[in-house]
Design a protein with these regions (language model features):
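Divalent-cation
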Residues: 1-125
Length: 126
């Protein structure tokens, strides 16, 4: 339904800023390498019940801050209950709907630009 790229990274426990580690993961995973700059990364640290959702510049410019806050609310609601999978599924569905509005799928031109697998970070480097 969308040409946007959604990725998930699950990280082991670590101390420090989840956002700064997520930003490094965003770069490491090539999230800025998409033609339309429309990648979204869900960075999850289950042991801390923490997450960060990052979007590349074009999706951010089109959806605004309210969208990111709504995704965070969905994740937070479920994470507080330990429902990591359910929260992530709901947030990814919402992200996909918004991506489809702004970056619709075109079978003639769409290329899967990033891997579809979940990233499991084995170590965190500061």
């Amino acid at each position: 339904r969308t040409s946007g790229e959604v990725r998930v990274s699950v990280s082991p426990f670590f101390w420090g800023s989840v956002r700064s580690v997520a930003e490094r993961a965003f770069d490491r995973m090539g999230m800025t390498a998409t033609k339309d700059r429309n990648g979204i990364l869900f960075f999850i640290v289950p042991a801390r019940r923490r997450f960060t959702v990052l979007g590349d510049r074009e999706i951010h410019a089109r959806v605004g801050q309210d969208f990111w806050e709504a995704l965070a609310a969905v994740l937070s609601e479920h994470f507080r209950k330990g429902e990591f999978t359910e929260g992530l599924v709901r947030a990814i569905e919402a992200a996909g709907e918004k991506l489809a509005e702004h970056f619709p799928y075109d079978a003639a031109t769409d290329v899967n630009e990033l891997p579809d697998e979940v990233d499991f970070s084995r170590s965190i480097k500061k």
